[in-house]
């Protein structure tokens, strides 16, 4: 029974350490991204103008095929 308890404790401890490691890596990634975004915003003196507005092109009309099923073109 002591061996099962020992294995269970080791498993839970390993899972906890894995979770802690993953969460710290995610936190570091977010911190780096935020720092990069803040530095990028500091370098920009004024926002760039929005892209020009494009009008929507009309859809292309494709006539239905004149060939019948089972017959050639």
Swiss-Prot record:
Q: What segment(s) does the record annotate as region Disordered? A: 44-73
The record places the motif (SCOOP motif) at: 59-73
Consequence of gene loss (knockout): Slightly increased growth and fresh weight.
Where's the motif SxS motif essential for MIK2 binding? 65-67
How does the record describe its quaternary structure? Answer: Interacts with MIK2 (via extracellular leucine-rich repeat domain); this interaction triggers the formation of complex between MIK2 and the BAK1/SERK3 and SERK4 coreceptors, and subsequent BAK1 activation by phosphorylation.
Principal localization? membrane
One Gene Ontology cellular component = apoplast
Name the keywords, alphabetized: Apoplast, Cell membrane, Cleavage on pair of basic residues, Membrane, Secreted, Signal
Q: Which GO terms describe its biological process?
A: defense response; defense response to bacterium; response to bacterium; response to cold; response to ethylene; response to jasmonic acid; response to salicylic acid; response to salt stress
Name of the protein in its database record:
Serine rich endogenous peptide 14
Task: Specify residue ranges for compositional bias: Polar residues.
Answer: 64-73
Give the species this sequence originates from: Arabidopsis thaliana
Q: In which tissues is it expressed?
A: Mostly expressed in seedlings shoots and leaves, and, to a lower extent, in roots, stems, siliques, seeds and flowers.
Report a single Gene Ontology molecular function: receptor serine/threonine kinase binding
Taxonomy, superkingdom: Eukaryota
| Subcellular location as annotated | Cell membrane; Secreted, Extracellular space, Apoplast
Give the protein's biological function. Answer: Brassicaceae-specific phytocytokine (plant endogenous peptide released into the apoplast) perceived by MIK2 in a BAK1/SERK3 and SERK4 coreceptors-dependent manner, that modulates various physiological and antimicrobial processes including growth prevention and reactive oxygen species (ROS) response regulation. Inhibits root growth and regulates root meristems. Prevents general growth and development. Exhibits antibacterial effects against Pseudomonas syringae pv. tomato DC3000, Ralstonia solanacearum, Bacillus subtilis and Agrobacterium tumefaciens, thus being an antimicrobial peptide (AMP).
The UniProt family comment states: Belongs to the serine rich endogenous peptide (SCOOP) phytocytokine family.
Residues of the signal sequence?
Answer: 1-31
Q: What switches on its expression?
A: Induced by cold, drought and salt stress, but repressed by pathogenic bacteria Pseudomonas syringae pv. tomato (Pst) DC3000, jasmonate (MeJA), ethylene (ET) and salicylic acid (SA), mainly in shoots.
């Amino acid at each position: 029974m002591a061996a099962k308890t020992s294995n269970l404790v080791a498993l839970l401890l390993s899972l906890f350490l894995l979770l802690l490691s993953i969460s710290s890596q995610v936190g570091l990634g977010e911190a780096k991204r935020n720092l990069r975004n803040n530095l990028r915003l500091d370098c920009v003196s004024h926002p760039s103008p929005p892209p020009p507005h494009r009008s929507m092109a009309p859809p292309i009309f494709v006539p239905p095929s004149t060939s019948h099923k089972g017959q050639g073109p």
